């Protein structure tokens, strides 16, 4: 189980490396040290009723429209993200629902447009910040509380 957890933690890190990069080093990322509580069902976009023998753990792409007032990392209750994420889920992940139990957490995201102004080295250093930890915490919570040793697929955009 530990090897499987370690392997999939690495896979999630790679997915996040491509999807969510950068945080302004001159400013602290908001919510940096506050973990999202994934025992709260409102912090999940999708928690299915188990009907299938396999699960999908899905991470949607950046789904918020940052404003200057938002900062570099959105909050877990960001209205823009919570409005867009279900639509993106319907377009990208609902196709799995006929064959799998699809789990999708809400997670804080970095401002993707600002990330373009950073060097790759800076981006790599910043990847392990808030969004990575939210996704990893959600994945670990899923494994410990929802998965029940079913096989699973990691899906993301």
Per-region residue spans from a language model:
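Bacterial N-terminal signal peptides that target proteins for export
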Residues: 2-10
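Hydrophobic membrane-insertion alpha-helices, especially the h-region
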Residues: 13-17
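C-terminal motif of bacterial Sec signal peptides marking the signal peptidase cleavage site
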Residues: 19-22
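N-terminal extension/subdomain marker
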Residues: 26-86
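Active-site catalytic motif of lipid deacylating hydrolases and related acyltransferases
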Residues: 61-152
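Conserved alpha/beta-hydrolase "nucleophile elbow" surrounding the catalytic nucleophile
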Residues: 156-157
């Amino acid at each position: 189980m530990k090897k499987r957890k370690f392997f999939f933690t690495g896979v999630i890190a790679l997915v996040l490396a491509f999807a969510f990069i950068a945080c302004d080093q001159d400013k602290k990322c908001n919510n940096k040290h506050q973990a999202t509580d994934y025992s709260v069902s409102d912090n999940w976009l999708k928690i299915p009723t188990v009907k299938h023998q396999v699960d999908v753990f899905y991470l949607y792409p950046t789904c918020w429209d940052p404003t200057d007032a938002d900062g570099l990392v959105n909050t877990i209750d960001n209205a823009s993200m919570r409005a867009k994420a279900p639509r993106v889920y319907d377009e990208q992940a609902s196709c799995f629902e006929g064959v799998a139990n699809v789990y999708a957490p809400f997670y804080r995201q970095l401002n993707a447009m600002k990330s373009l102004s950073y060097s790759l080295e800076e981006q790599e250093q910043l990847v392990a910040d808030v969004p990575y930890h939210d996704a990893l915490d959600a994945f670990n919570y899923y494994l410990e509380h929802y998965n029940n040793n079913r096989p699973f697929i990691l899906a993301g955009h």
